[in-house]
Design a protein with these regions (language model features):
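Rossmann-fold NAD(P) dinucleotide-binding segment
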Residues: 275-289
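Glycine-rich phosphate/diphosphate-binding loop of Rossmann-like nucleotide-binding domains
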Residues: 54, 192, 199-261
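Histidine-anchored nucleotide/phosphate-binding helix
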Residues: 54-67
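Gly/Ser/Thr-rich loops at beta-strand to alpha-helix junctions
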Residues: 50-57, 77-81, 128-130, 218-219
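An anion/phosphate-binding loop that grips the pyrophosphate of nucleotide cofactors and donors
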Residues: 264
Length: 299
């Protein structure tokens, strides 16, 4: 019986080429891979990873496999899955992958449960869906879990709420708190990729537009920097007074979203939270304006 669920196995060769291309830009992970081949630190450990199924994640999975881990990968977001990468991991590395680009909600949670069926010792989450499903619906599998990791702000918020309630049954490392994560991935990676997504989706000229950034955490800082670099007039909205002051000192206009709503041409929120843009904000916007939510939850 095939222990995977992907779109098309014939896409594997193209996926392998793209995975190797991404590896060129990942020298630290490559050096860890080489060390893991010799040390095998995860021998006998089962890992269930719920992450974006991309070329970068593929290199992480093969590195964990090289370290002896028995890994299963499922998608943390159906919209980001790269089907050729999923096929390559299955066909060339024999890593079970359950991920199809554009999968519906039922399939998404079927795949989440496939990750739990693996009886993981360690969970790797991006959005905390495996951990939350374990605690809500599959508690009989908690006994095998010794710990986990959570990559993104949205997931960390969920898990900290569980921990505060005494509901979190095992320790989870908040990867997002690592300086190498938020200083670089959040600020530079998310800043660039968000701008790339906005331009691809809208084909807008950014120069001269009033660009409203909701929040001033590390992701928002990166986007504000990129938008200004492309000639936008950037407004920042931020409820934390210290971060708001920092945005002012960085040279941005700072105001409430109520004040910014009628001024903006493009709105992008990067807070990992709800109600940054609400009905009354949309009602105050220009007749033609563009909104973009940059957060884990897209379903």
């Amino acid at each position: 019986m095939e222990n995977f669920d992907i779109k098309d196995k014939s896409l594997a060769e193209g996926g392998r080429r793209r995975i190797k291309w991404a590896e060129r830009e990942m020298p630290v992970l490559r050096s860890i891979h080489e060390r893991f081949v010799k040390e095998r630190p995860f021998e006998g450990i089962r890992m269930s990873a719920c992450l974006h199924v991309t070329t970068e994640t593929a290199n992480l999975m093969t590195t964990l496999q090289a370290g002896g881990a028995d890994v299963v990968l499922v998608a943390s977001n159906p919209l980001s899955t790269q089907d050729d990468v999923a096929a390559s991991l299955v066909m060339h590395n024999e890593i079970p992958v359950h991920a199809i680009k554009g999968e519906d909600n039922a399939t998404y949670y079927k795949h989440i449960n496939s990750a739990i069926d693996h009886k993981p010792h360690i969970t790797m989450d991006d959005g905390a869906d495996v951990v939350s499903t374990l605690h809500k619906d599959r508690r009989d599998f908690l006994k095998d879990v010794i710990g986990g990791t959570e990559e993104t702000t949205t997931g960390v918020i969920r898990l900290r709420a569980m921990a505060a309630d005494g509901a979190l049954a095992f320790p989870v490392v908040a990867v997002n708190d690592a300086m190498t994560k938020h200083f670089f991935d959040n600020r530079y990676g998310t800043g660039q990729s968000t701008m790339d997504g906005i331009i691809r989706a809208t084909n807008l000229l950014i120069a001269g537009k009033t660009f409203v950034v909701g929040g001033y955490g590390w992701c928002a800082r990166g986007l504000a920097m990129r938008a200004r670099g492309m000639g936008a007039n950037v407004i920042v909205t931020e409820i934390d007074p210290l971060k708001a002051l920092e945005a002012v000192m960085d040279g941005f206009r700072v105001m409430t979203m109520v004040e910014a709503a009628p001024l903006g041409d493009i709105f992008c929120t990067l807070t990992g939270d709800l109600h940054v843009l609400d009905k009354h904000h949309f009602e105050a916007m220009k007749a033609v304006s563009y909104t973009h939510l940059r957060a884990h939850e897209t379903r």
